[in-house]
Amino acid sequence: MKKLFFFVLIGSSILGFTREVPPSILLKPILNPYHMTGLFFPKVNLLGDTHNLTDYHLDNLKCILACLQRTPYEGAAFTVTDYLGFSDTQKDGIFCFKNLTPESGGVIGSPTQNTPTIKIHNTIGPVLFENNTCHRLWTQTDPENEGNKAREGGAIHAGDVYISNNQNLVGFIKNFAYVQGGAISANTFAYKENKSSFLCLNNSCIQTKTGGKGGAIYVSTSCSFENNNKDLLFIQNSGCAGGAIFSPTCSLIGNQGDIVFYSNHGFKNVDNATNESGDGGAIKVTTRLDITNNGSQIFFSDNISRNFGGAIHAPCLHLVGNGPTYFTNNIANHTGGAIYITGTETSKISADHHAIIFDNNISANATNADGSSSNTNPPHRNAITMDNSAGGIELGAGKSQNLIFYDPIQVTNAGVTVDFNKDASQTGCVVFSGATVLSADISQANLQTKTPATLTLSHGLLCIEDRAQLTVNNFTQTGGIVALGNGAVLSSYQHSTTDATQTPPTTTTTDASVTLNHIGLNLPSILKDGAEMPLLWVEPISTTQGNTTTYTSDTAASFSLNGATLSLIDEDGNSPYENTDLSRALYAQPMLAISEASDNQLQSESMDFSKVNVPHYGWQGLWTWGWAKTENPTTTPPATITDPKKANQFHRTLLLTWLPAGYIPSPKHKSPLIANTLWGNILFATENLKNSSGQELLDRPFWGITGGGLGMMVYQEPRKDHPGFHMHTSGYSAGMITGNTHTFSLRFSQSYTKLNERYAKNYVSSKNYSCQGEMLLSLQEGLMLTKLIGLYSYGNHNSHHFYTQGEDLSSQGEFHSQTFGGAVFFDLPLKPFGRTHILTAPFLGAIGMYSKLSSFTEVGAYPRTFITETPLINVLIPIGVKGSFMNATHRPQAWTVELAYQPVLYRQEPSISTQLLAGKGMWFGHGSPASRHALAYKISQKTQLLRFATLQLQYHGYYSSSTFCNYLNGEVSLRF
């Protein structure tokens, strides 16, 4: 919305300075690229007659401007018989505003007998049509008079309108037509391959005898929006039929920006004739509507229809393959709160790649003359109404996706088929839920989907949750799972139809036929606080006499659970044991209720419970089960039962008992990455401790400063079912050094690290701050050199976990760490190696490291809490030999090579307490195992650049059966 109002503000500002131009002037630029103020010319300077155009091209112009034209022609600014093209208009754009004609086409029009083509393409600047009008007063007394013919196209009236490949906003704002096409009226309209947004804002048309069709766009054959890069915005347009768009066929295909239909109105306010009813608050088509393969979000929100279809009225609708799609707060004064479907072709709504959500769409049922609702049929929630006698609708969701109805749907005729997840690729969830219904609005009308149609579930999940009720006459399950959650009701009913044309009227009844072969109980939903167990119900038969309705049990209903498998699942149909707190025992927990007309009418005693106890991750334990049976007394005469819930005599409750036995985490939740962050800290700090500051003992006092860059790469191999990791670090350091016979140095460094889990996208990004102090001592008059080093490091870390196995989810966490380290090295004096100039000496050292993490909780999918139970402690004893070689060129150089065996003297492996918040399961995470023996190496080279300046390069690391570590440092020292 911010983008929308930005464009509106900019457009209005550009137009503001031209609005007082005398109305007798039609403004059209000449080819010379003068400043915009030079584009205002008197009418005599125009090139050609703009009201008698046949084949006219306006190409490569700096600006096209038409304002305040009031003419008697069809097209206040341009009258076209064949073709008018706007091409390659430069950055100043096209502006047409406040033009007026009593005929059709507020800016561009055509004689009645002609159907010209209008083409706007390849423009760089904005294209804006604002406040244009085609209008003539209409009189009811003589509707056939020529003066009362249709006035259409508030901005453009033509045969074909093509808008393509434009670089900037194309906008139609506050245009008005008396009959149809508040902004555009055409035989064909195509908006394709544009690089910027399309805006229709506050356009309107009103109804005459022919009907006010298309508040923004009216098309008599086909309308298309295809392969555009930016947003398509239809805001606050109004008309009788199709508040924004009216067309026989309409397609929105392959667009990459958001598609928004907001606060459009389909109304009826001038003529009471019924030529075109006020249907489709946003879109009305008479043949087919395709909204497919659009990459971004789609919104139909706050649209209103005077009759049917608060957002969409269509005989056939295909809504498939799109980005996240939302139908919210739409209102139809009759039925079809969001969508109204009338045709006999098969419609399809599928959440293939992202969710589709229907929420708080209202069917107002305004049946009284004053527009009010009947007390017997008040306003209620309604997502979709299918009022066709044949055909069908396919409702589905792709893998890990959801098609969610927070509003009931209505299918009125038995000849219609409803297929849930018909295609094999549709393994997601079709959900009926009452989760968003406020407590004050809880009623059967807001929760129940009741239909005589034939329903079939083939794949995936059909979920009924949070007090929603699905009442069916004919339901068959050939595959998938019927998932029942908190307060869900799946019921059967006897459908009856009355033929009023017969004398006396005849009533035909159809007995219920429901077959289930796999039921899933949504364990997290049923066990949450305040939840109710789901219900399978054979609804009684109602009989109304006068003002009294009584109920009798339906013994003829066929509702079969014979051989049906019972599973325990979560809301996505997966194992529930990681998402449900099963740490405590459950005793005789009510999980499923059955209300039936005769004993074992549903054949529940023949259900298959073999899938209840299956191997799984998460909480471990054992389920046992049994049925509790109750039978109502039969003393009450059936004719006196007025409560439908008391009509059935037989009731069963499934009771489950759970005995817990520990917790086993799923591999996708274990996350060794967090513990491996400690290993990353330790490895980096260890190599820092080995990194010499270039200290040396001199025969005079000195002090100096140092600075340089560093980098490190670590490859940790997978071992013992741990994935391993690789780490990349870069940073810089600065410090000071001082001394004489003993030296002391202090160094500060900052580094940036990315630690990636091997064979996965998971990673931790870190920023570390380190302080390191070093002292070099000469003992026993130079017989032994001792180096003491201490280090402290503080790190800020951001973890990123990705769940890619059939999901597209992620979680993030922020935490910090502290690392402490110390080292001591003992070197004997360097001595010549044989007769060579190479000096050698043995050395011995000890390195101790300690690192721990702060506790933190992730956000995102599957959030977890991490707490360091035991920090990582690692003590090394490197022992080896080093050799040194010097040359005395004009830039003296010294080379040193070290080779050492580096065993682990003591190690405390890190232990990270991890808890999955959804199910409160806890386990201890460990890092990737590291070898206890390694070969360490170091190569350093020092060059004296100037008397007081030296350059030192160091490469060191170690190799083991588990780890390959490489560290590189370059440093310049200035000594005084």
Curated annotation (Swiss-Prot):
Keyword match Transmembrane: yes
PROSITE patterns: AUTOTRANSPORTER (PS51208)
Gene3D superfamilies in alphabetical order: Autotransporter beta-domain
UniProt membrane topology term: Peripheral membrane protein
Cell compartments where the protein resides: Secreted, Cell wall; Cell outer membrane
All copies of domain Autotransporter, residue ranges: 695-976
Record-linked InterPro entries: Autotransporte_beta, Autotransporte_beta_dom_sf, Polymorphic_membr_middle, POMP_repeat
Keywords (A to Z) from UniProt: Cell outer membrane, Cell wall, Membrane, Secreted, Signal, Transmembrane, Transmembrane beta strand
GO cellular component terms listed in the entry, alphabetical order: cell outer membrane; extracellular region
Pfam families attached to this UniProt entry: Autotransporter (PF03797), Chlam_PMP (PF02415), ChlamPMP_M (PF07548)
First and last residue of the signal peptide: 1-18
Electron transport among keywords: no
Family affiliation: Belongs to the PMP outer membrane protein family.
NCBIfam families: POMP_repeat
Protein name: Probable outer membrane protein PmpE
Organism classification: Bacteria, Pseudomonadati, Chlamydiota, Chlamydiia, Chlamydiales
